[in-house]
Amino acid sequence: MTHCENCCKSLPLAIFLIIVLGFAVYSNCLDGKFIWDDFGLVKDNAYIKSWLNFPEIMTKGMGAGSGSSSNFYRPLQMVTHMVDYSLWKLNVVGYHLTNTLLHISAALAVYWLINIIFCSQPLAFLTASLFVAHPVHTEAVSYISGRSDSLSAIFILLSLIFYIKSLSSVRNKTYILALLSCVFALLSKENSVVIPLLILLYHYAFKSKFKAKEFLFISLIVLGYVALRLTVLKSSIPVSPVLFQRIPGFFVALAEYARLLLFPFDLHLEYGNRLFSIFDPKAILGLAIAVSLITIAVRQREKNKLVFFSISWFLLALLPVANIYAINYSFMMEHWLYLPSIGFFLILAKGLCLLYDSRRFRYAAAALTISILSFYACLTIKQNNYWRDPVSLYKRALQFSPDSWRFLNELGLEYADRKLNKEAIAAYQKALEINPGLAGVYYNLGTLYSSAGDDRQAIISLEKAVELAPGYVDAYIVLGRVYCRANKKEEALSLYKKLMEIKPGLAAARLDSPCLYFK
C-alpha cells in the first residue's frame, strides 16, 4: 500500500458522522466543574484574563499566572484559555465545549492523514471514529487542563499532512503550512518533538521521495525548541530516579497501555510515581509486548506496510512520554496515549475493513463495528460522569490509590466548598496520617476549623502549618486573625512582627495587623 498522490476528496457524510459521534459521547461532560489543575491554569490564573498579559503567557511557565511554578511551557494552550475567558469568562460550559471541539478536530485530522496515506475513506473513517469514541481519551477531553494533548495532536497531524502534500507540490504554500503547524505543535506540548521521527517513519514505510532540505528545516525548528527548553525556557526538573531505575516503569506502563486500549476498564486519574523491578511480572509482560511489537513490525515491513506503520507510530509516539527524560513524577498517564493510540486504531480499523470486504462476514463485520463503537461510547459517557463531579473523581481515584494524600487533600477542599465540614476534616486528617509534613493540608484544616468557629483546633493546625513552612504567608495571616478573635493579643502581635521580618513589603500583613485592633 503506497501513498496516493491524487487521493479522493473527503466524504462529507463521514466527516459529519465523526462530528456527531464526538458530540454524542462528550455532551454529558459539558456541564462539568473546574477540577484539579483547572484552578491554577484557568480559574485563578490572572494572565488569561487580559490580553495585555500575552507577553507573559509566551515567556513563562503554565502556572505563572496563578503564582505557581511549572515544568511545562505550553503557551498555545494558555492562549486558548485566554480566548475561552474572552468568550465565556468563567462559565465552565464554554471551556468544555472548546475541549470537545478540539478532540473532534483531532479526529478529523486523523481521518485526513489516513485518507491521504492509504487512499481509503472507510479505513480513515473507522480509524477516526474509534479514536473519537475510545474512553481512554476522557482525561484529555473531559478535563479542561488536559487539552494540550488534543491541541498538540491536531498540529502534529497537520504538520505531517502538509509535509506529505508538499512532496508532490511545486508550490511552497503547503510546506510553509507544515512548518507553521510544527511550530504550533511545539507551543502546545513537549511531545511534539517526535514530528521528525514520524516524518522519517513515513518515508521509510512507504519509500516516498525524501527531500533533505525540507526535512532539515523542520528538524532545525524542533532542535531549536529543544535548545530553548533546556536553556532559556528551562524549568526545574522534579527529583527523579536515574534512567536505569525508570526503565522498568516504562515496560509496566506499556503493559498497562495495552490493557487500556484492548479492555478500557478501571480508568482513573494518575498512576503515581512508582519504581518497579525489571523482574516485576508487569515489567516482564511489557518487555515481551515491546519485543513482540518490534518483531512483528520488522517482519511486516515489506509484506504489510500498514502494520509496520501502525506499530512504529505507536512506539515512536510513546518515546517522549517514556520517561527517558523525566519531566513528570508519574510513570504513566492515560492521556499520554492520545497520539500513540492512533496506531492501534489504524490496525483495528483495517481488521474490520478486511472482515467487511469478505462477503461471507460482511454483516458480522458491520455488527462488530457498531458493537465496538457502542461499547467505547458507553464507557466514555460513563467515565465522563466521574470527571463532571470532583468528589466522584477523587473518590474513584482513591479506590486505586488509597494512600494518595493529594487526592485526599483535594477531596477535603471539595467537601469544604460544599460545607460538608465533617467529611472535609476526615479527608484532611487521613492525608496527614499518610504524610504528617504537609503544611498546606494543615493550613486547609486550620482555615476550615476557623470558618466553623473552632478557634482551638484552628490554632493547633495553623501553628503546625507555619512550623512546617516558616514562609507560609497565608497561614500567618489566618493564624493572626484567629489569635485576634480568640483574644490572644500578644501571640497575634508576635506573629505579625515575625511575618513583617519575613515579608517586610507585604501590604496584606500591614492591613491585617492586630495593632489596628488593639491600639
Q: What are the roles of these predicted feature ranges?
A:
Residues 2-447, 451, 467, 472-474, ...:
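Polytopic membrane enzymes that build or remodel cell-surface glycoconjugates and lipids
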Residues 6-10, 485-486, 517:
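Residue-level detector of bioactive/disordered segments in secreted/extracellular proteins
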Residues 417, 451, 485-486, 519:
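Register position in tetratricopeptide repeats
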Residues 439-441, 461, 486, 494-495, ...:
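Low-complexity, intrinsically disordered tandem-repeat tracts enriched in small residues
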Residues 463, 467-477, 481-486, 490-494:
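Ankyrin-repeat and related helical/solenoid repeat scaffolds used for protein-protein interactions
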Residues 493, 501-519:
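Terminal, low-structured helical/coil segments at or just beyond the last alpha-helical repeat
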